[in-house]
Amino acid sequence: MSVADIRKGAEQKMQRSIDAFKNDLSKIRTGRAHTGLLDHIQCDYYGSPVPISQVANLTLIDARTIGVQPWEKKMVQVVEKAIRESDLGLNPATQGDVIRVPMPALTEERRRELTKVVKSEAETAKVAVRNLRRDANEQLKKLVKDKEISEDDERRAGDDVQKLTDKFVAEIDKLVVTKEAEIMTV
């Protein structure tokens, strides 16, 4: 394994950590509606659990309302029940074959709780990135021990890995600031 392989592997894994963090952030409800909010909700479809997006059309009706239109009429009640029983605290209302999902306004206390959740998720993502840095540095030390690279090369590669770590941690911080602003906006 070469220094370039170690660096590239670390960068790819760090990017995956960022992607997972973005995915976690998208599940945190803000006062604004977005269809991604319902992505992880499963409903029963002929005996097997499937995401709502696979049995219905999801659209934004306005800034605070999501429209869910199941493709099969008999799925309307099933989808509505799945949304109501989710952990998002939503109260869907059916109008014909369209389910309207209004986003309730967040209380100040709930907004503060959500910002704490965001910070906690961010810290978890940062720890994952730092663990990947540690793994890459251990691989570099092994190359030095096996006399495949010099200590100077290890130091340079270690600096590169540190720069990657700093870049991804800064990206996490930027995502946190954006999400907190989104949550705190009334």
From Swiss-Prot:
Single GO cellular component term: cytosol
Main location: cytoplasm
GO BP: any one term: cytoplasmic translational termination
Superkingdom of origin organism: Bacteria
Family according to the record: Belongs to the RRF family.
PANTHER family on file: MITOCHONDRIAL RIBOSOME RECYCLING FACTOR PSEUDO 1, RIBOSOME RECYCLING FACTOR
UniProt-recorded name of the protein: Ribosome-recycling factor
Upper taxonomic lineage: Bacteria, Pseudomonadati, Pseudomonadota, Betaproteobacteria, Burkholderiales
